[in-house]
């Protein structure tokens, strides 16, 4: 009996974090869950190709084509069709409403490229986060995987990993190091942790 937890990954761009999740599934790091669906807010996202290559179903819901409610309703329909239990935001560039988030309490996870509570919240995304860390002069940064609630980057922390900052770092160099040494490691590990806990709770009810 396959009682794996159904995972959806929401993307908008290149999908390097999605690839880390796919690789982790293949290598046995993620065993309690299975990626059943990739939803992209951008029809040209390379992440869709990565999903296709891995044999994962894809759905495109372009934000610009809909009101916020219609956009989210389309995503929810796709999630419900695949009986999705856990949602991973992997470079998803649209903010989800409080109503959407409330439907999946402690079931939506996001990776943020800093050690929350530093350099997070509204306006902190992509290279901006790394530029802020360098401008501030911190010696250590990293990545955080957290649950998503109605406050940007405000949900409970699941996992963090620190990355040292070097003297000659640029935002681009730092971004690459944080991705490779932190994000690509803790996002799959956190996804497995959340899925394992859900699976255990389901088994207790049987």
PLM features per residue range, with description:
Residues 1-206:
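One-carbon transfer enzymes
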């Amino acid at each position: 009996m396959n009682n794996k937890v159904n995972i959806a990954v929401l993307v908008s761009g290149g999908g390097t974090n999605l690839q880390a999740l796919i690789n982790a599934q293949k290598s046995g790091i993620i065993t309690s869950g299975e990626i059943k669906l990739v939803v992209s807010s951008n029809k040209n996202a390379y992440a869709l190709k990565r999903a296709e290559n891995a044999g994962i179903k894809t759905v495109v819901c372009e934000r610009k084509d809909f009101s916020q409610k219609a956009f989210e309703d389309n995503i929810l329909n796709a999630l419900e069709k695949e009986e999705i239990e856990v949602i991973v935001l992997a470079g998803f560039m649209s903010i989800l409403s409080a109503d959407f988030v409330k439907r999946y309490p402690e079931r939506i996870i996001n990776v943020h490229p800093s050690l929350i509570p530093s350099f997070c919240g509204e306006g902190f995304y992509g290279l901006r986060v790394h530029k802020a860390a360098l401008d501030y002069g911190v010696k250590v940064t990293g990545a955080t995987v957290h649950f998503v609630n109605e406050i940007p980057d405000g949900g409970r922390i699941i996992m963090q990993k620190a990355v040292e900052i070097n003297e000659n770092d640029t935002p681009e160099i730092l971004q690459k190091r944080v991705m490779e040494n932190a994000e690509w490691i803790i996002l799959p590990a956190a996804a497995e942790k959340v899925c394992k806990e859900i699976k255990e709770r389901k088994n207790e009810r049987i």
